[in-house]
Amino acid sequence: MEIGKERRRDSFFPRVRELAKLVLRLVDMAELGRVSMTTWPELKPMKNRLVNYGVTENGVAIIELVSDSDGEPLEGDRTAVNTYTREMWHDIDDAILSARFDDDVSVILLTGHGEKFFSAGASIKYLNKLTPRYKYFFCLHANETLSRLEQTPKIVIAALNGHTVGGGLEIAMAADIRIARKGNFQVGLPEVSLGVLAGTGGTARLSRLVGKAKAMEIMVTGRKFSFEEAKDMDLVHDIYDSMTLEEFHQDVLDYSGRFTLPFAAAKAIGNIKRSVQSGLEIPLEYHLALERELQSDLFQSDDAKTGIKAYVDKQTPRFEGK
């Protein structure tokens, strides 16, 4: 009889915990003036079948990297390591442009396929076949694609579902916000162990994100570290204690929803991103001038009128992105 009670207790408490998390999620969304149960959409493969793409009902574009350790389309039971090749960069580029030109998209969400990896970076087997000149243009293409992502005036969130190393971290660093899944996963730029450097934006972005001294230590040692350490240095913004991959997807979608219409002023978010991205590279007085121009643009927008009027009337604004 006691054994039966233990079994019932073992099956009961996990359900209670899940219900409690759902209630807390609804409370969080209610505080934001929204209750949206948007779910993970059906994703469809891009041309080379190395990226899956889809858009949620509330305007979150999902770009999912999916390949094996050779950088080939995932077949059978091969582990999704999500390494990239030139063909994957073409798919990533096409997905970014699809999201950029879609007026219904407010947020771009990057993630990796499977339970283990966000991305392990470039396929070493693929790179080993290339000439030095080809590798140079390979890095240039990656630079251009990630710069396009950074210059898209929509918030970009990287959902780090697993190991994020090498070029995988370089992709993640081009996002505006990085959210990791709790687990025994590693982060790092170990390229020095191959006799090269992190050449698709690693040295440039890491030094800007964590500072020169910390970036140097990470890259010259090539060491890998945990998401917790990454969070301590502000390389990762948050770590979600999601029990399953599906729950992690839902948790990140719920967070992403706060940046979607009509709950967030998408035009203002885009201008904030433009000011931060472009302004850091110019003298302060020019940055202030850019800021004024972007603010002037917003003052003339319908969203600014909506937001200011709602504040005066003590109402919740509903933005249209105009």
For each of these PLM feature ranges, what is it?
Residues 9-12, 16-111, 147:
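Conserved CoA-thioester-binding segment of acyl-CoA-metabolizing enzymes
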Residues 67-79, 112-145, 164:
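Glycine- (often His-adjacent) and acidic-residue-rich active-site loop
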Residues 87-101, 124-161, 204:
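An acidic, glycine-rich surface segment that forms the CoA-thioester-binding/catalytic face
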Residues 145, 149, 159, 165-219, ...:
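CoA-thioester-processing core
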Residues 177, 217, 221-223, 229, ...:
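Well-ordered beta-strand positions
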Residues 180-185, 236-289, 302, 318-322:
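C-terminal long alpha-helix characteristic of the crotonase
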Residues 218-219, 272-276, 311:
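Short alpha-helical scaffolding segments that buttress acidic/His motifs in well-ordered protein cores
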